[in-house]
Regions:
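Domain-terminus/edge residues, biased toward the C-terminal soluble/receptor-binding domains
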Residues: 2-187
Length: 187
């Protein structure tokens, strides 16, 4: 599933892929034939709300069995979700869609976007060579947001700076480096 998620994440950078991935229905160029995404069509037919699934591709292999790679929209943020080894059983049909929706609902109920650093926050300072002053503050250029558990502890967030010394003259808004943000050791 991880490999499929990485492939989907990469493919979503291609506009043509997104156009096909997001479409629910296709019509042939001569207008004679139509295709629908059966996995979504059958779920909607059985009154399953699939609105959080913005795009998807289903498949089957003997190894992974029924799979669904999808793009979920949860509170206006997009997540790639891949489920595999899904099996229909008595009372549990549309397994790949239901598994995907269960994961999406879990994310919606337990995670949210947190603004962890506001724009123009002083984060550090760097040395300046040949300047009238020997250091300058490093300020964030924009708000920094992250998807975190609803009950996260701010002390679990750590920052790792990759800063470089600057040489005068220093221009306003000159980039001084980068910063990695970690939540409980996960970047």
């Amino acid at each position: 599933a991880y490999d499929m998620a990485k492939i989907t994440q990469y493919a979503l950078k291609n506009k043509k892929f997104v156009e096909v991935f997001d479409r629910y229905q296709y019509t042939s160029s001569d207008g004679q034939h139509q295709w629908v995404k059966k996995v979504i069509y059958k779920s909607k037919r059985d009154h399953i709300d699939t609105s959080m699934i913005e795009g998807c591709k289903s498949g089957y292999t003997s190894k992974a069995q029924s799979t669904l790679s999808s793009l979920l929209n949860i509170n206006d943020h997009h997540y790639v979700c891949v489920v595999g080894f899904s099996k229909n059983s008595d009372g549990y049909n549309h397994c790949t869609v239901n598994d995907t929706l269960a994961l999406g609902n879990y994310v919606k109920d337990h995670y949210s976007v947190a603004n962890i650093i506001k724009k123009d926050t002083k984060m550090n300072s760097v040395k300046i060579k040949n300047g009238q002053t020997n250091k300058v503050d490093v300020i964030t250029e924009k708000d920094i947001e992250a998807v975190l558990p609803n009950n996260y502890n701010p002390s679990d967030i750590k920052y790792k700076y990759h800063l470089k010394d600057l040489t005068a003259p220093v221009k306003k808004d000159q980039k001084a480096g980068t910063m990695d943000v970690y939540y409980r050791d996960t970047k």
